[in-house]
Amino acid sequence: MQRKLLPLALLILPLAACASSGEPRGSSGFSARANVGYGKTSDGSFDPSGSSASGEYSPGMMSGAAIGYDINERWGVEADWTYRSGDIDSIGTGGSVANSGDYASVAVTGNVIHSFATDSPWRPYIGAGLGFLQEIDADLKPSGAEVSDRGALAYQFLAGVGYRASDSIEITLEGRYLGAEDVELTGEGQSFEAEYEHVGVMLGFRWLF
């Protein structure tokens, strides 16, 4: 999955260069953002076909990018791509399904952002989004099986604060919650129905142009 970060970097960097060399903009205009963070998949059901089990997970890294448009000083929209990763501690009683492994997802969402105007460089904001899991996969150990799903409906809520470091650069810190419905992980003759909820914190750099 991490190889998919390269096209996003190639897209964001030229936009950032344009932003840094441009004139100061008003309250509306386009933006590009790059994020890194840390988060955890919530423990929950990870049910084999015809049975039930629960999964326990450890935190992992997050990374992502977004292209947005500020309609005015209060409202904006963005297309967001975020990669989330973490470790599997156990699935099933005593790790009967898996006692280690990796669990990761790529989510694509369209977000609506509401900002609270202040007479300072600080910009508190909240947002909500709807989209899908471009990919979610679990590598189960010690069996070595890999199961995955694509296209599951996903929804997102976020809240954060931005600091306007210059006319064209804003630094953001935000918390995010992502949930997904009807995740069905299949592969190598195995099938699972899983809950997927993830909570994380991300640091971002947003270029305004």
Model-assigned labels for residue ranges:
Residues Y125-G129, L133-R176:
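A charged, solvent-exposed segment within the mature domains of Sec-exported extracytoplasmic proteins
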Residues M1-G29:
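Cleavable N-terminal export/targeting peptides
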Residues L15, A154-Q156, G200-M202:
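A broad helix-preferring feature
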Residues V106-T109, E146-V147, V183:
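Outer-membrane beta-barrel porins/channels
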